[in-house]
Amino acid sequence: MKLTTKSHYSVKALLDLALQPDYGPASVKAIAERQNIPGPYLEKLLITLRRAGIVNAYRGVRGGYQLAQAPDQISLGQILAALEESLEPFPQYGDDQSLAEDWVTLSVWRQLHQKFVKALYSITLADLYYDARSWQAAQGEGINFIV
């Protein structure tokens, strides 16, 4: 699996939302500026995440996007699934001779894939947030809102 720009930017934006006081809404412009993400691209990503129920959108002067659930309830697996990212570590094989010849290798890849997917669904935005804060503290950095 390859982490795409779409996935990377989405996780950065969602972590930014997790940093909002009381998880309140933040505008696309504010998130884009803090995270160095192109605004129009970020808007498309947030629309996709809204349709998947990961964020809520609010209109008006104090509107913007906010997490639909607490950060400890949103996993990396959910985010990637919402973006329709492929989690497949190997090409799809048909029922031909090559599959029979490679069954041992494919079995290992399938087991690794299952463990990988399980790990993605066990890592939450809260985990990433605390990992980032721990790293910053170890580096002697203050609170930094750039993820």
UniProtKB/Swiss-Prot annotation:
Q: Tell me which domain of life the UniProt entry assigns to the organism this sequence originates from.
A: Bacteria
A Pfam family reported for this protein in Swiss-Prot or TrEMBL: Rrf2
Among the GO molecular function terms of this UniProt record, one is: DNA binding
Provide the GO biological process annotations. Answer: regulation of DNA-templated transcription
- Kindly state one GO CC term assigned in the UniProt record: cytosol
**Designated name of the protein:** Putative HTH-type transcriptional regulator slr0846
State the UniProt keywords alphabetically.
DNA-binding
Per UniProt, residues of the HTH rrf2-type domain are: 2-130
Xref: PANTHER family: HTH-TYPE TRANSCRIPTIONAL REGULATOR SLR0846-RELATED, WINGED HELIX-TURN-HELIX TRANSCRIPTIONAL REGULATOR, RRF2 FAMILY
